[in-house]
Structures are given as C-alpha cells and as structure tokens.
Curated annotation (Swiss-Prot):
Stated name of the protein: CASP-like protein 2C3
Assigned protein family: Belongs to the Casparian strip membrane proteins (CASP) family.
Segments on the Cytoplasmic face: 1-13, 75-104, 168-185
Lineage: Eukaryota, Viridiplantae, Streptophyta, Embryophyta, Tracheophyta
Organism per entry: Zea mays
Entry membrane topology: Multi-pass membrane protein
NCBIfam families, per database record: A_tha_TIGR01569
UniProt keyword Membrane, yes or no: yes
One Gene Ontology cellular component annotation held by this UniProt entry: plasma membrane
Amino acid sequence: MAAAARVSEVKAEGLLRGACAALAAAAALLVGLSTQTETVLLVRKKATVKDVQALWVLAMAAAAAAGYHLLQLLKCLYLGRVGGARPCRRSSRALAWTCLLLDKACAYTTFATTVAAAQACVVALDGAHAVQWTKLCNIYTRFCEQVAGSLVLGMLAAVGTAVLSAASARNVFRHYSSLETYAAH
C-alpha cells in the first residue's frame, strides 16, 4: 500500500513539474521573442527584451527554471518506472536534500526575477515624471501586453515551484525517524 501511494506521489510530482516546465518555458519564450517596431517622431524604434535588463534576466531565469524542471521530470519518470528498486537510505536522503535545496533556489529565483521585471514594467506603464520618462506602453502596446502575459506565466511557475518545494521538504523529512521511535528506545 505504501509503495502504491509513493508511486502516485511521484506521478503527481511529475505532472506538477511538467506544468511548471511548460509555464516557465512559455514565459521565457513569450518575453524573449517579444519585439515591436514603431515610428516615433519620424524615427523607427524597435522595442526588445534587451531594452530592459530585468526582462532579459527574467527570460534567462525562466529558461533555466524550465530546464531544471525538465531534468527533475526525467527523474520522476525514472523513479516511476523503477519504483520497486530502492537506493540505499543514505544516498536517497542526500538526493532528497539536494532536490529540496534546488527546488527552493528555483522557486526564489523565479519569484524574484518575475517581481523585478514587474517592477521595471511599472515604469514602462506609468512613466517616471521626475526624470521625464514617458509612458512606453502607450507606444508599444503589443510588446507590453506580451510582457504582461509572460509575467503572469512566470508568477504561476513560481507558485508551482513553491508547491514543489513544499513537497520536496515533505520528502526530506520522510527519511528521518519519527519521535515515537526515539521515545521507545
């Protein structure tokens, strides 16, 4: 019964990892491939992701998160197929700790880069009157809409990664004996 429950947990983790990988990849592609060219005062200007450093960092971090989730998805698929073969307790404990730390790092990085990009986009949306920056989203509407979509996808990927991090923490603590075992000795 415990083995069947573990296999279903691995499948659920695999589904969530696949969803997070898809969301992060979509966010990276949407922001990374967004461009728009407009004529402003007889000058053609092209808006790209490299114009705002925070958007470029978001594209790279989301792509890295998608790659990480794909690697972890392969691990889930492997464990789902070889569910009966248990590695030694010490190596599985080390693997659980490694996955927890990597999941936490991925969650924090995805969340931080998405929020930083959102903060940079607020300036593009509202402008900064103190330094006479105009509202860029009035000019590059489609570009701003695509960036907003990638911010939503990035935040959903960050939330999914946080849920995976909680599942990884549960997996780590599963490797340690309960307090009742220590009380009996």
